[in-house]
Amino acid sequence: MARPSRDGYDRGMKALVLALCLIATPVLAQDVAGRFDYYVLSLSWSPSWCATEGDKSGAEQCAAGRKLGFTVHGLWPQYEEGWPADCRTTAKNPSRQETAAMADVMGSGGLAWYQWKKHGRCSGLAAKDYFALTREAAKRIRIPEALSAVPRDVNLPAKVIEDAFIEANPGMQPQGITVACRQKALQEVRICLTRDLQPRACAPDSQRDCAGSFLMPAPR
């Protein structure tokens, strides 16, 4: 069988590279800092995270006696379909002091640093402004009294938690909150907000709840 000429091989490789670039370009073009549609405020249920991950690594937020309930996992820029991550930005990274200062709402400075790298850079904000916005978003959401101090482990369906948040936060709508589970335990509550932190409906790809009942372990 005749071998292809070197010129023919080069032309074929150039065509392949061009095709791959045309496929990849729309994806890469999406993840530009500051270009997104809304935010998701993710509130992690610390007892579940500590039981599955944090205790094993000796995480700061899982220290004995802290008895943390809901903490901020992150404030995530979202598209109406999908989400950006690890965006390129000219914003400077936060100092260790700035990330450590977020431990009171996020559980640890390490998590604040990770969230900045993956999500904060996509906000188009300076690090200090992104953390200030994260803190403000958390401040605007009232944790239902019944869920702020769970005295013992309980099994609940997602709707009970959603209804409690909606009742405690006027303006929040059923389509604007989702409950996520992991290993049959409550993982997080995710609340959709406009760019100026007003309640809004989540995009369809973010409206996924836990199926059935799940464990909500008590803080310890």
Can you name each region flagged by the protein language model?
Residues M13-A19:
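Sec-dependent signal peptide recognition
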Residues V40-S42, G54-R220:
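Domain-level detector of nuclease and nuclease-like folds
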Residues A24-P26:
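N-terminal signal peptide c-region/cleavage motif recognized by signal peptidases
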